């Protein structure tokens, strides 16, 4: 049995869960999330705990078992607490600012990059070198953060670029002058 899949998910006090027509809906103070279930797994609610069980023991069923347990867990966490990713910008003249609903990035190119976030995600710039992305859908928050990072990934020689706050950039040593 999947080690992750067999652990029950604790249902938070503020969260409400509903299963109808193979669609699981979790709602809470921050919003509502829905997820389509695959036929290999089923979800049961009892005593404030959500358990995910699988139909058979095939390889796909075992994979879906752990996956859907974590998806349900992330949905419960998202509608109660929410998720946040933090990006750090390093480099001379590199900065970010919010212009109405657009994120304006100055990253050393000949032009500014404007990024419009999806409606489910909020972006904030507490200072010009920090970007905070928050929302209730963990996958969408991570996807938006990865898209912003892709505009200028950190380079290994000086570390200039956009990186996640918990990311460690592997640095390389530059060329050294040799004897002729």
Curated annotation (Swiss-Prot):
One of the record's GO cellular component terms: cytosolic large ribosomal subunit
Keywords of this entry: Ribonucleoprotein, Ribosomal protein, RNA-binding, rRNA-binding
BP-aspect Gene Ontology terms: cytoplasmic translation
InterPro entries hit by this protein: Ribosomal_uL6-like, Ribosomal_uL6-like_a/b-dom_sf, Ribosomal_uL6_a/b-dom, Ribosomal_uL6_bac-type
GO molecular function, one term: rRNA binding
Superkingdom to which the source organism belongs: Bacteria
Subunit structure: Part of the 50S ribosomal subunit.
Family to which the UniProt record says this protein belongs: Belongs to the universal ribosomal protein uL6 family.
Matching PANTHER family: 60S/50S RIBOSOMAL PROTEIN L6/L9, LARGE RIBOSOMAL SUBUNIT PROTEIN UL6M
Biological role stated in the UniProt entry: This protein binds to the 23S rRNA, and is important in its secondary structure. It is located near the subunit interface in the base of the L7/L12 stalk, and near the tRNA binding site of the peptidyltransferase center.
Protein name stated in the entry: Large ribosomal subunit protein uL6
Organism: Prosthecochloris aestuarii (strain DSM 271 / SK 413)
Lineage of source species: Bacteria, Pseudomonadati, Chlorobiota, Chlorobiia, Chlorobiales
Gene that this polypeptide is encoded by: rplF
């Amino acid at each position: 049995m999947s080690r992750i899949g067999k652990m029950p998910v604790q249902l938070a006090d503020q969260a409400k869960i509903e299963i109808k027509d193979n669609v699981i809906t979790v709602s809470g103070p921050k919003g509502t999330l829905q997820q389509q279930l695959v036929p290999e797994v089923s979800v049961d609610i009892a005593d404030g705990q959500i358990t995910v069980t699988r139909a058979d023991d095939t390889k796909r069923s075992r994979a879906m078992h752990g996956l859907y347990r974590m998806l349900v867990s992330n949905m419960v966490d998202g509608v109660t607490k929410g998720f946040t990713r933090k990006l750090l910008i390093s480099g001379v003249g590199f900065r970010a600012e919010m212009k109405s609903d657009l994120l304006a990035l100055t990253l050393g190119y000949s032009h500014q990059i404007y990024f419009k976030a999806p409606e489910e995600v909020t972006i904030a710039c507490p200072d010009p070198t920090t970007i905070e992305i928050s929302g209730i859908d963990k996958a969408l928050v991570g996807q938006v953060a990865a898209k912003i990072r892709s505009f200028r990934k950190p380079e290994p020689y000086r570390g200039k670029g956009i990186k996640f706050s918990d990311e460690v950039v592997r640095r390389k040593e530059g060329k050294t002058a040799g004897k002729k």
